[in-house]
A protein has these predicted regions:
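Thiol-based oxidoreductase modules, predominantly thioredoxin-like and allied folds used
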Residues: 68-90
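A short beta-strand-turn-helix
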Residues: 23-39
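Typically the conserved alpha-helix immediately C-terminal to a functionally engaged Cys/Sec
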Residues: 53-67
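Non-globular targeting/processing and membrane-anchoring segments
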Residues: 25-26, 132-162
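Short, internal strand/loop/helix patches
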Residues: 85-116
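Short active-site neighborhood of thiol/selenol oxidoreductases, capturing the structured segment around
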Residues: 35-49
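Bacterial N-terminal signal peptides
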Residues: 7-18
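Non-catalytic, surface beta->alpha helical segment in thiol-disulfide oxidoreductase systems
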Residues: 104-146
Length: 162
């Protein structure tokens, strides 16, 4: 009998522990996400885009320098219909469809988007070297976390106004 009650207590403890939400998790619609993000870096690119060949390696170095798990790289690739479909799903899943629609068809830049408010904070393009990208992204993230308004003129005009 003692074994049975100890076993029941152990099973109950395991069940309770397995349903606990981690302290670092973000509760969303009664589920939790351990991988909650602060920023999305949306790279608008295509295989045939000459500026992309400059921007992408610099952006990769900048993100490697930052090593921030709360910054997510989101590729908006329009190289082919299949790539475009994947990009549309990525934008939809992250609720950044307005940015996707605004710049669909333009390439060679990355938009920095607040993952919480979905506000575009700024952009990086071929005029930025890797160190400047790192600094700009870090600054935009700090401003987003403090909920400060940003004024950034580095983003291109809308390709698809609406």
């Amino acid at each position: 009998m003692r074994f049975l009650s100890t076993f029941a207590l152990l099973v109950t403890a395991i069940a309770v522990a397995s349903t606990a939400t981690p302290a670092s998790a973000q509760v969303i619609d009664s589920t939790y996400r351990v991988d909650a993000k602060d920023l999305y870096v949306m790279m608008f690119r295509a295989d045939w885009c000459p500026p992309c060949k400059v921007v992408e390696p610099r952006l990769d170095r900048a993100l490697q320098t930052l090593r921030d798990p709360r910054i997510e790289y989101v590729e908006i690739d329009i190289s082919s219909p299949g790539a475009s479909e994947i990009a549309a799903h990525a934008a939809f899943d992250r609720e950044v469809v307005p940015q996707y629609n605004r710049w669909l068809g333009l390439t060679g830049f990355a938009a920095i988007v607040d993952a919480t408010t979905k506000r575009t904070l700024g952009c990086v393009n071929v005029l930025y070297d890797a160190a400047s990208m790192t600094s700009h992204i870090r600054t935009l993230k700090q401003q987003a976390l403090r909920d400060e308004q940003t004024v950034d003129f580095t983003c291109p005009e809308a390709h698809n106004p609406g």
